[in-house]
């Protein structure tokens, strides 16, 4: 397929030929779902911890005799029904939340989301950013020129470009990453994908 490449003023300056295998497939919803779940699960740190009845402080003896008091029988003040007692089936840090997805499914999900951006006209390719210094004002102007200033946008450059990152940091709803950091969740979380020509080629080389 061929798509237009714009300059930062919003002018069409040339066409770029992109591989249909990466940018033009029918989106596979299950692959997308599985990959997002896997990515989110990997972020869970598993740092929550509560004490069981074996770990809380308190005596192990019976608080009162079994019969004759008129009260319900109790075995220990560390039992879960007591205030300050242990927690039953509480969270522990040894739980492995990881959900594995094989490379083929992950790649299919990636191509599916990229194709979805093209299909929904939410992909904008720019030739390059040419900031002389960090400038939020200039980035806002660029986004207005590209008609994406009111959209949640993911900006992707081939390498990390500090001037682009610093220029977009203070703009609500805008995130900037390099091509090797691109992931399915960030793509789905943004309405518009603003990618440089170099970054688009780099992404295609990985997934073609």
Swiss-Prot record:
The gene is rplD. InterPro entries: Ribosomal_uL4, Ribosomal_uL4-like, Ribosomal_uL4_dom_sf. Part of the 50S ribosomal subunit. GO terms for biological process: translation. Residues 50-83 are annotated as: Disordered. Belongs to the universal ribosomal protein uL4 family. One of its GO terms (cellular component) is ribosome. One of its GO terms (molecular function) is rRNA binding. The keyword RNA-binding applies. Transmembrane segments: none annotated. Gene3D superfamilies: 3.40.1370.10. It comes from the Bacteria. This is Large ribosomal subunit protein uL4. Pfam families: Ribosomal_L4. One of the primary rRNA binding proteins, this protein initially binds near the 5'-end of the 23S rRNA. It is important during the early stages of 50S assembly. It makes multiple contacts with different domains of the 23S rRNA in the assembled 50S subunit and ribosome.
